[in-house]
Amino acid sequence: MFQHGVVYDYLNTKGKILKTYFHLPILIQRILWRKGIKSSITDNISFKENVWLEPGRMYTDENGNYHSMYGAKLLQTLNENCSTLSLNKNPELESDYSIDQFGFPSAPLDDIEISVLSDLNRVVKSMKNGGFYSKQEQAYILSALHIFFHSFRKYYSILKDKSVKRLFFVAHYHNEGIIAACKKLKIECIELQHGLINKKDLYYVYDAVFKNALRNALMPDKIMLYGPYWKSVLDYGFEWVDGTKVIGGNYLAHEFKSPNLSKKENLILVASQKGMDDKFIPYIQSLKTTLKGHPDWKIIVKLHPLEKKIDRYQVLRDSQCEIAPLHSSIFHFLERCKIQLSIYSTTFFDAAGYNVVNFSWVTNGIGSDYASSLSEDGIVIPVRPGDDIVSIYQGLAVSQSEFLSVEKIYSKYDPQTFMQP
């Protein structure tokens, strides 16, 4: 939570500063945390032994059917012994329950909740007396701690006195409240890798200096990984102990097939990233300018499936630039394109086996370390906005596409790893 607060302060994200209760006596805090919201479902619901927290990321197959990007194979493997709790309103994806159906508990805090709240207050007191953080940093950190306890109390009340043994979810960061609830209830929590993990990742690869502190960190009991490459990345850090890094293989909805490389076109695939329209739109506009010298080349922009500012990208549309449908398959375009362009993205790894050359726009600020690490590993070729990428591509002496085998990135799906306690 301290890391969240410091990052928000660095980004100056004003909307992340909340009104908190930590300045009040703890007895008053306990009363305020009883301000509940009535649930729209009864309290006597039953969960299966396994629970999947569906984040709402969808994949569209060739027939236009929607599938859970991360949960489709998991649910098929666990079959009737798994309940789905949806975290997003996606009518296309079936679920047993939606998080919106559960209100906020109005019952008095029990002994475990009081203990957690007391621990948080001790942490807050230590932070304020330590003199290490600025007033604004403290405001962000207090907000992060408030959100943590809100999440903890909600999921603790949802999962308490149920028969749940294992909970599957994506992204441990910003979900520490869920992890804490599972720890208190002795529920095994298992993270599914949901995208790019980088050696410079702020949440996945911590330096040795943090080793002692990480012993008390709220981390999942296991993380399921796509393949051995990702395990080797986590091995650089010190938060994942032996036995917690499990190679589950390609549990994504998409099945990898041998691409038809005869379909290759003079096409540049731009894979955007969520919430980065302020960078991608001008970068793509500069790319379009360079293509005036290459009229036989075209651009297709594949937006992140969770992109909210879709309309902003429409200004790019013309005869040389297409915007792909939001939930279309990235692999359909990798089969056709010769060049992929982004900043830092999992799609660079998806390009393995597709005879695609990856280029990464060099930027400043958050994310620059990620991109430089990909360049150091030979996964991307760094370029600047405005560079003539087609000419650079045409001047390459050797194909850069086979940086890693598909098997190292996405191993064969192993259902047994998801069934073992």
Across the structure, where does each feature detected by a protein language model lie?
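Catalytic-core helical/loop segments in enzymes performing group transfer/polymerization on anionic/lipid-linked
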Residues: 1-421
